[in-house]
UniProtKB/Swiss-Prot annotation:
Organism for this UniProt entry: Pseudomonas fluorescens (strain Pf0-1)
Molecular function terms from GO: peptide binding; peptidyl-prolyl cis-trans isomerase activity; unfolded protein binding
Domain PpiC: start-end pairs: 164-265, 274-373
Protein name as catalogued: Chaperone SurA
Gene3D superfamilies: 3.10.50.40, Porin chaperone SurA, peptide-binding domain
Gene: surA
PANTHER family xref list: CHAPERONE SURA
Keyword match Repeat: yes
C-alpha cells in the first residue's frame, strides 16, 4: 500500500463530494470516499506495471473486500490497546523517506506534488503499523518451529536446495552427435582437452566459448547465470564444491558432449566464523541499603583486593550479585560479545587477556572483569539452522495468516451496501 504514496495523480481527486456508507463492518463502516481513493491507487499501480485492469465493478468489489479485512484488523488493534506514538510514526515516515533517497521534508514535498497530503500519508502509515502489530500478536507470536522440523528441513532435498550456495557459471560445450561412434567421441574428447589446455594457459574463457562452444549461450561467452549448487548434476556438484572463483573444470562427458565449466562467482553457503570471548566478572548492585557511591566503592575495593593477590573466583562467589555466574566464580564461559550490553562489550574489547579491568558501570550495576581467552568459532551450522528456522517460520506465518484472516472475516458482521454488489449480512 505504501507504494501508492508516489502515484502520479492525486488519489483524492477520485473522492466524491457526497460521501456515503458502502459497508458496515462490525462496529465501524467503510465509506465511499475510502473505496474510491483505494480503487484509484490500485488502478494507478496496475497501470504502472503495464497490466490490464479488471472490469470496474469487479475491481470495486475486490478492493472493498480488502478494506473490510483491514478494518476488522484495525478494530482488533483498537480493542487490544495498540497505539502508535508520534515518535514511532515519525521514525517510520523517516525510514520510508530514506528508502526513497529523500529527507523527510523532500518526502513531504513529493507527496504534495503528487496530490497526496502529508497528513493522509501519515494516517495510512499509522494504519499499516497497527495492522502489522495486530498480526504479530495474533499470528506470528503463536508460531512454533521444533528442532525436529529444522533437522528434517535441513535433511530434505528442498532444504538443501534453498540453503545451498549459489554459483555463477560459464560453460563450453564440445558436442557429440546423438548416434556418434567411438571415433567421433574420441575426436570431441581431444578437442575438449585442447580447449581446456588453452584455457589453463591463459586463454580468455568467453572468447573460447564464442569460438568453440555449441551451447545456446555461446555468444554470451558461455554465461549460464546463477545456479544453486544443489541443483547441479554429478559430477559437477562434487567438483565445484571445492573450487575457488576463477577455477575451471576438466572436460566432463555428458549426453550432449563434453562440458568445461568456469566458476565466475559464488555467494551464500560460506563458512561463517563468530568471535567468542571467555570472560569472568564480579557484579555489585546499588540497593536500598547501599547507594550508588557505596556500590562504586565496593567495586573499587574488590578490584584492589584482586590486584593485591586475592583469588578472583572466591571473591566472585562471595560478593557477585550475578546469579548466573557467581557460583561459578564469575565465569561467563565462552560468549558472543554481541549478547552483552554495549558498556560491558566495550570494556571487554579493550581489555588485554589476563588483565583485570578497572571498575565500570552498566545498567545492571558496577563490574570488574577479566578476559581469559579469545577465539573464532565456526558457526556455519548454527547459521544454517537459523536460516532453516526463518524459512519454516515464514512458511507457517503465510499459511496461518491466511487462515486467521478468513476466520475473522467469517466471524464478523458485514453488510455490503455497494450498488451492484451482492448484498451480504453476516
Amino acid at each position: 500500500m505504501l507504494g501508492a504514496l508516489f502515484l502520479g495523480t492525486a488519489a483524492n481527486a477520485a473522492v466524491q463530494s457526497i460521501d456515503r456508507v458502502v459497508a458496515i463492518v462490525d462496529n465501524d463502516v467503510v465509506m465511499q470516499s475510502q473505496l474510491d481513493q483505494r480503487v484509484h491507487e490500485v488502478q494507478q499501480t496496475i497501470a504502472k506495471r503495464g497490466g490490464g485492469l479488471p472490469p470496474p465493478g469487479v475491481l470495486d468489489q475486490q478492493v472493498l473486500e480488502r478494506l473490510i479485512v483491514e478494518n476488522l484488523q484495525l478494530q482488533i488493534g483498537e480493542r487490544s490497546g495498540i497505539r502508535i506514538t508520534d515518535e514511532e510514526l515519525n521514525q517510520a515516515v523517516g525510514t520510508i523517506a530514506q528508502r526513497n533517497n529523500m529527507t523527510p521534508e523532500q518526502f513531504r514535498i513529493a507527496l504534495s506534488r503528487d496530490g497526496l497530503s502529508y497528513e493522509d500519508a501519515r494516517e495510512q502509515i499509522r494504519r499499516e503499523m497497527v495492522i502489522s502489530r495486530v498480526r504479530q500478536r495474533r499470528v506470528a507470536e503463536r508460531i512454533q518451529v521444533s528442532e525436529q522440523e529444522v533437522k528434517n528441513f535441513l535433511a530434505s532435498d528442498l532444504g538443501k536446495m534453498q540453503l545451498s550456495e549459489e554459483l555463477h557459471l560459464a560453460n563450453i560445450l564440445i558436442p557429440t552427435p546423438e548416434s556418434a561412434n567411438s571415433e567421433a567421441i574420441q575426436s570431441a574428447a581431444r578437442k575438449a582437452m585442447e580447449v581446456y589446455q588453452q584455457l589453463k594457459q591463459g586463454a580468455d574463457f568467453g572468447q573460447m566459448a564464442v569460438a568453440n562452444s555449441a551451447s545456446d549461450n555461446a555468444l554470451e561467452g558461455g554465461d549460464m547465470g546463477w545456479r544453486k549448487a544443489a541443483q547441479l548434476p554429478p559430477p559437477f556438484d562434487r567438483e565445484l564444491s571445492s573450487m575457488a572463483t576463477g577455477d575451471i573444470t576438466q572436460p566432463a562427458r555428458t549426453p550432449g558432449g563434453f562440458i568445461i565449466l568456469k566458476l565466475l562467482e559464488k555467494r551464500g553457503g560460506e563458512s561463517q566464523m563468530r568471535d567468542e570471548v571467555h570472560v569472568r566478572h564480579i557484579l555489585v548492585k546499588p540497593s536500598p541499603v547501599r547507594d550508588e557511591a557505596k556500590t562504586k566503592e565496593l567495586a573499587q575495593s574488590l578490584y584492589n583486593r584482586i590486584e593485591a593477590g586475592e583469588d578472583f573466583a572466591e571473591l566472585a562467589k562471595k560478593y557477585s550479585e550475578d546469579p548466573g555466574s557467581a557460583l561459578n566464580g564469575g565465569d561467563l564461559n565462552w560468549i558472543d560479545p554481541n549478547a552483552l550490553v554495549p558498556e560491558f562489550r566495550a570494556v571487554m574489547a579493550k581489555s588485554p587477556q589476563g588483565q583485570l579491568s578497572k571498575p565500570f558501570q552498566t545498567q545492571y550495576g558496577w563490574h570488574v572483569l577479566e578476559v581469559l581467552g579469545r577465539r573464532a568459532t565456526d558457526s556455519t551450522e548454527q547459521a544454517r539452522e537459523q536460516q532453516a528456522m526463518t524459512v519454516l517460520r515464514n512458511r507457517k506465518y503465510d499459511e496461518e495468516l491466511q487462515t486467521w484472516l478468513r476466520q475473522i472475516r467469517d466471524e464478523a458482521y458485514v453488510e455490503i451496501k455497494l450498488p451492484g454488489a451482492d448484498q451480504a449480512a453476516q
